[in-house]
A protein has these predicted regions:
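A short beta-strand-loop-beta hairpin characteristic of the jelly-roll/cupin
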Residues: 109, 125-144
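Conserved metal-binding segment of the jelly-roll/cupin
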Residues: 142-156
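Conserved short histidine dyad/triad with adjacent acidic residue
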Residues: 99-118
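Short, surface-exposed charged micro-motifs
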Residues: 98, 125, 158
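Short connector loops at helix/strand junctions that flank enzyme active sites
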Residues: 92-94, 103-105, 119-123, 129-131
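Asparagine-centered strand-capping/turn motif at beta-strand->loop junctions
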Residues: 159-163
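A short hydrophobic beta-strand segment most commonly corresponding to one strand
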Residues: 122-127, 148-150, 164-177
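Non-heme Fe(II)/2-oxoglutarate
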Residues: 1-90
Length: 177
């Protein structure tokens, strides 16, 4: 496969998961931040819940977050030290990142991460909970807990929760090189 690469399997994510359980109020917390505008939920329909640790930003109201390099740590960033340890050890130059939760039986349809921000970034997933199918272009894999993967987010990609529990994955971007 050229658009999905398994980096490692069997990573112990139990401490990361425990911190998620300890701070359930962090899910969706970026919606309550001052001076933060969320994309129109009628235009961007999804059943995914988000816990952003480093989110994109804009400097002007008419700017698209996909076309800026602005990265802002959310208040939840400080609480989730276990995932930060993982990132600092393995990918210390990470940029935007967060946890995504997909309910049982749900899917995220094929989409491309658009904007200049993504042109020089690699995107990774670390699976925290549940089993899911991930598809990129015409390739697909089944992802289990503790799997770290890279994928080409510049072509259509999406996911289906195959498990009997909410799928949680940690998504993060790293500049090329």
């Amino acid at each position: 496969m050229k658009n999905i690469k398994i980096i490692k399997t069997g990573i112990n994510v139990s401490k990361i998961r425990k911190q998620l359980e300890k701070y359930p109020e962090d899910w969706g917390s970026q919606k309550g931040l001052k001076d933060v505008e969320i994309k129109d939920p009628h235009q961007y329909i999804t059943s995914v819940d988000v816990l952003q640790l480093v989110m994109g930003g804009v400097s002007k109201p008419d700017e698209d977050v996909g076309n800026t390099e602005i990265c802002t740590k959310t208040p939840a960033y400080k609480k989730h030290s276990e995932i930060r340890k993982f990132l600092n050890k393995n990918y210390p130059n990470y940029r935007r990142c967060g946890f995504l939760a997909l309910p049982v039986g749900e899917m995220v349809g094929a989409h491309i991460d658009e904007g200049t921000y993504y042109l020089d970034k690699d995107r990774y997933h670390l699976s925290i909970q549940g089993q899911y199918k991930y598809f990129v272009g015409n390739e697909d894999i089944v992802v289990d807990v503790g799997t770290l993967l890279w994928f080409n987010n510049k072509i259509p990609h999406g996911t289906v929760n195959l498990g009997d529990e909410t799928r949680i994955t940690f998504v993060f971007d790293v500049p090329h090189g």
